[in-house]
Amino acid sequence: TLGWFDDPLLNTFIHWPTGRLAELMFHELAHQRLYIADDTAFNEAFATAVGRLGAECWLAQRGAAREREEYETDYRRREDFLRLTTATREQLVAVYASTRDAAEKRAEKWRILAELRDRHDQLKRDWGGYGGYDHWFEQDLNNAKLAGISTYHRLVPAFLALYEREGRDFPAFYRAAEVIGQLPPPEREARLRALSSVSASIAANRGGTGRE
């Protein structure tokens, strides 16, 4: 709530791995550092990027090797999950925008969601049986649920690219993010999309996520 209320620290957080808990703290603190009114996608992507970067730096300085390895494994799984859900949402958007009749759209929607579950089962096998997303898949799957994930993560690559562009210097990164945040919404979106394209190009060249 950005200081308006005493935000709870739930007891469930205490059992999180060290890196994940550090990421949560940096994420929430990022909202106090920069918040743009009426732009949830910007705010959450900025905070998510800061959470990731902050956790990396904190673990590099203070974390044990086991904690760093555990965090990287967790992060790779989350990246796999995000790629899966993003691809599924793009499929659904294409179906909704098509000229098919309502019955055909519904049938295709259920086929796509069934495929999503199957692909998650394959990911679980690739992860050695890790079931951290089982609860998410046990709930009702729909486009709104997938859109919520997109809100938090769609623009994260843009902020990671901005951090790299600013020489991995946090003060410079914050200043650059503030400048973008003050732009009119259409220009702000265009600037972030351009940065996302840079991040995608780096990832393609490295065969990874765009970060070393």
Regions found by a protein language model. Name each.
Residues 1-78, 93:
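Acidic/His-rich structured neighborhood in mature extracellular/periplasmic domains
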Residues 82-206, 211-212:
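Pan-zinc metallopeptidase signature
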